[in-house]
């Protein structure tokens, strides 16, 4: 009977710690996801009765939780980006999307098929799920000053990349599912899952973002109607995502574009944008605490044992070789200096978004016989990313900001 009281106490203590954890991590130069991971492992070891995965949660649970965290973080990412960026500035994120992301997918596909001996659809699925950088765990390398109209190139590029690529990975998740179910018609996939759904997602995001921005700016002019509170950003997030998905678009893209449209609207008062961003950021942190604590417990509950040493080798190659090399090739001959190129290339953090894509695919098709191995490999990659990037990113960003 008292289990739920223990859960409340444990979550309360963990979220209370989160109030100071970012400041502490900045001081000791270790990213706070590492500290949360350790806390989660300790809570599991002590037997705190949370809903620990054994070693997996049901796909439906994983889908709903990761989906909520990702779309909230995408709204936050869009609201962070200042308005004083030219088409020239946006070339860097698009290089990462159009060059780095495909190169990453190709490398992961061959590593999965040749080293892990996975089937073609499983290799494509793993490649697509690991290709996007994570908008949630990558918060420390993204723009920190949401009130600024322009930030340094590294923060901007990583924030914009995380916002865009989460939607652009989806066509290849569809591709893996269609191949697994032997239903692939290449022309239909390209026209529908690639072109049409991306277009609809961007269009819905722009329409909702500009419309809501107009309302935020106009309604307070009517006597008796005050400026909206920060929680309106959460309302916009869920509304945009839901409408885009219902109208056959990619909701992730729609949410990010909606946030950008509001941020870019000159007439919307800056303080309102900051309130919206701050509320979303607090919600994101709360959900992030819960997710990492649970993930920390799952690591001790056997999720890594399934892929064994091969999963560890795969994760090491991915984090230390594939993303940095693909990232640097994508930025080749760009106008960034060497330190900026290295920082952007190395800081391709992976996380919760990958879990969403995998759980979504497994709910669409039961033909992925390597399901547990795929989850295990993804867990290795996320763990390696949290630890390696968590120990190095604070130092890298300090060096970048000095330059």
Enumerate the language-model features and the residues they cover.
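Transmembrane helical cores of multi-pass secondary ion antiporters/exchangers
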Residues: 1-403
């Amino acid at each position: 009977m008292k289990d739920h009281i223990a859960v409340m106490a444990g979550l309360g203590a963990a979220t209370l710690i989160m109030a100071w954890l970012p400041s502490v991590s900045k001081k000791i130069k270790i990213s706070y996801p590492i500290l949360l991971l350790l806390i989660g492992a300790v809570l599991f070891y002590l037997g705190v009765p949370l809903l620990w995965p054994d070693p997996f949660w049901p796909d439906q649970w994983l889908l709903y939780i990761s989906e909520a965290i990702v779309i909230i973080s995408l709204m936050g990412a869009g609201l962070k980006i200042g308005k004083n960026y030219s088409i020239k500035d946006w070339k860097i994120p698009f290089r990462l999307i159009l060059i780095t992301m495909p190169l990453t997918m190709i490398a992961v596909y061959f590593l999965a098929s040749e080293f892990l001996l996975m089937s073609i659809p499983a290799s494509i699925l793993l490649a697509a799920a690991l290709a996007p950088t994570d908008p949630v765990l990558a918060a420390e390398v993204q723009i920190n000053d949401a009130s600024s109209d322009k930030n340094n190139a590294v923060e901007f590029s990583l924030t914009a990349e995380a916002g865009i690529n989460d939607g652009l990975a989806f066509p290849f998740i569809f591709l893996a599912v269609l191949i697994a179910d032997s239903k692939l018609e290449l022309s239909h996939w390209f026209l529908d899952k690639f072109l049409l759904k991306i277009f609809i997602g961007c269009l819905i995001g722009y329409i909702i973002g500009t419309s809501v921005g107009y309302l935020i700016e106009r309604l307070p002019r009517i006597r008796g109607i005050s400026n909206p509170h920060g929680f309106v950003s959460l309302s916009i997030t869920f509304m945009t995502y839901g409408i885009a998905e219902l109208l056959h678009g990619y909701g992730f893209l729609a949410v990010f574009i909606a946030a950008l449209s509001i941020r870019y609207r000159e007439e919307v008062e800056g303080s309102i944008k900051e309130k919206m961003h701050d509320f979303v950021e607090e919600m994101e942190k709360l959900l992030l605490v819960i997710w990492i604590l649970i993930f920390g417990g799952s690591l001790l509950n056997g999720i890594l044992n399934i892929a064994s040493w091969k999963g560890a080798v795969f994760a090491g190659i991915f984090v230390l070789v594939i993303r940095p090399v693909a990232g640097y090739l994508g930025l080749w001959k760009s106008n960034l200096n060497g330190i900026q190129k290295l920082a952007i290339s190395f800081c391709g953090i992976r996380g919760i978004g990958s879990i969403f894509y995998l759980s979504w695919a497994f709910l669409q098709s039961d033909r992925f016989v390597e399901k547990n191995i795929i989850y295990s490999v993804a867990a290795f990659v996320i763990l390696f990313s949290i630890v390696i990037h968590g120990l190095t990113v604070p130092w890298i960003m300090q060096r970048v900001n000095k330059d």
